[in-house]
Amino acid sequence: ENIIGTNRKVSGQPYAGSLFKSQNASTWTPNQNQDLTFVMNRADYTINATAEAVFRNASNTPEVKADLVQIIPEEIVMNNTAITWGIKMTDMATTTLDTNYTNVTQKTNYKLPAQRRITTTAGSYESKATLTSGSSHISPVIDTARNSVITIENLINNVTTNETNPEGGDAIARYITRRVNLKDGFDATDLNVHLTAIREAGSTIGVYYKVLSQYDTQTFDEKSWTLMNEITNINSVSGSDTEDEYLELEFSPAGINANYISNLVTYDSFKTFAIKIVMTSASTTKVPLIKDLRVIALA
């Protein structure tokens, strides 16, 4: 054998030493007349060529619906190498697998254009990895035993009937604040609600309020919800291609203030209030997102 990087033959051991042979895995016997060499083989990858690996669900997979997915592959991507991913899922109506792969970024949420599902049938979900390398010495690596996908189903519908009732309602997506009791002497006459939200075309955000005067003999639970008016950015929608286009929305009671009539008595102030936000959408993949809620009780 030649010395690495030269045309000179290896003529001898450059370092003084002995070869130790293991005996019964406990003692070592030296041999002064022998040495140990290794032959190391490596793969020779084709530069800039592509290789594909396709992963499918097994037949015992629980059925799930998906409006948003995130693939989580365990992979090693070294410098000058790359892995790109695509997915196929099953159509909700036709129960057939998508024809083409949709490009996704690993460990990043991807909002589907329409709801999809993974069924109990093997192959109702596919993820395809495309591996490339700019070096003949190295390749990206995928751990096939730790390749997973997270699916998120949005629970939302497009009805708002019975939402003014004291309790219940037909909308699925609702958020109700806890009951707020103002300090003695700080009774309010009006409410102002501010939301920072994404509202795509086809989706709506409705804000309701419920108030109770300290002089009212009814209980808070008996009071009905009242729909508020949107007073800024009315009917405006966020762009459909981004999840960062938030709108500043403001809501206030429909009348001059939040006074109400109960048992023929008009109450001009209130001590207790709560807010209910009702979200609806014609598509489960285009849902409102709210990241900030501010409620101001005005005297």
Language-model features, listed with the residues they occupy:
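Beta-strand-rich ligand- or partner-binding modules
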Residues: 9-299
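Extracytoplasmic/surface-exposed domains of secreted proteins
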Residues: 1-2
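Ser/Thr/Pro/Gly-rich, low-complexity intrinsically disordered stalk/linker tracts of secreted
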Residues: 5-6
